[in-house]
Design a protein with these regions (language model features):
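Alpha-helical cap/lid subdomain in secreted, periplasmic
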Residues: 1-138, 142, 146, 150-157
Length: 160
């Protein structure tokens, strides 16, 4: 991905860049041959290095980069009713804290709080402003996209 992203940034020469990452950073993953997840110091170091690399590549031309927080999700429940690990708010909070820390190290990078927009009460919800914004607990509905895009565009525009 680094070479592909670098080539794309150099080819497009954007005025501003929007980076939306994080869902996969909250799931259990195999790293260096063992299962791990955010919150494990070794995996956190790996995630942070990859995040720093992404921010450096996307912002390599000096362009303003905006990064969204990850919203809480509810992809489903285990048979016992508990949330799957990636849907646990603690993991999302850890990733978003990592984002905040990484962003603070780059003068051309800012944050858009997508979590607050999609979860205004601080917890997962499928409906916001009377609109069903999530279809499966993770992905946006068509109505959700129509509702979110103007806000997202304005957020990027204001930042640039």
């Amino acid at each position: 991905w680094p070479a592909r992203w670098s080539a794309q940034v150099n080819r497009d020469q954007p005025d501003v860049a929007l980076l939306i990452v994080g869902r996969w950073e909250t799931v259990d993953r195999v790293n260096e041959g063992r299962w791990t997840h955010i919150g494990d110091p070794t995996f956190d170091a790996y995630l942070n290095a990859e995040l720093q690399r992404a921010l450096s590549i996307v912002g390599s031309t000096g362009v303003r980069v905006m990064v969204t927080t990850v919203p809480y999700s509810r992809g489903g429940e285990k048979p016992d009713g508990r949330l799957y690990p990636e849907d646990q708010p603690e993991r999302v909070n850890k990733w978003n804290a990592m984002l905040h820390n990484a962003i603070s190290q780059h003068s051309n990078v800012g944050m858009i709080d997508l979590n607050k927009k999609l979860c205004p009460d601080g917890v997962y919800t499928a409906k916001v402003d009377g609109i069903k914004v999530r279809s499966d607990g993770v992905h946006l509905t068509q109505e959700g996209v129509k509702w979110l895009i103007p806000w997202l565009e304005d957020s990027v525009r204001v930042a640039s």
